[in-house]
Amino acid sequence: MVKTGRDAGLPKPDSDDPTSPVYWGHILEPIVAEQYSQQTGRKVRRVNAVLQHPDPEKHWMLANLDYSVVTDDDVQILECKTAGEFGSRLWKEGVPDYIQCQVQHQLAVTGKQAADVCVLLCGQELKIYRIERNEELIEALYVLE
């Protein structure tokens, strides 16, 4: 919605407001990444760049990664999430669809094969989900985006 301008009438999340979930997600992201490393033994590195799809016909596809997983053949991307009392309901049956699409978009831009999504639910339960590259979904995203 941001890319198309359809978000113009919607309220904007305030990352400086300590009552906002966005604020807490930003504060807790490094802690979630550290806990992921401790639980999996995988090393992660913060990605401080906007990545662009290498195909000139898809140059409009950009991605912001939270972390890259280094020296691991099974997984290359780490997406960190937090969810409070209400947001955690979306995670009852696994990774919500909108997060699945976000991660498939990241895999499309980077050419990577798999990502882990690490979510802190209600500030005390950490869950890790593996998302493998799905070419059919990526092709659908190309059309939709």
Where are these regions (language model features)?
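Charged, glycine-rich intrinsically disordered N-terminal tails and low-complexity linkers that flank
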Residues: 1-27
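Nucleic-acid nuclease catalytic cores
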Residues: 22, 38-65, 69-144
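Gly/Pro/Ser/Thr-rich low-complexity, intrinsically disordered segments predominantly at protein N-termini
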Residues: 33-35
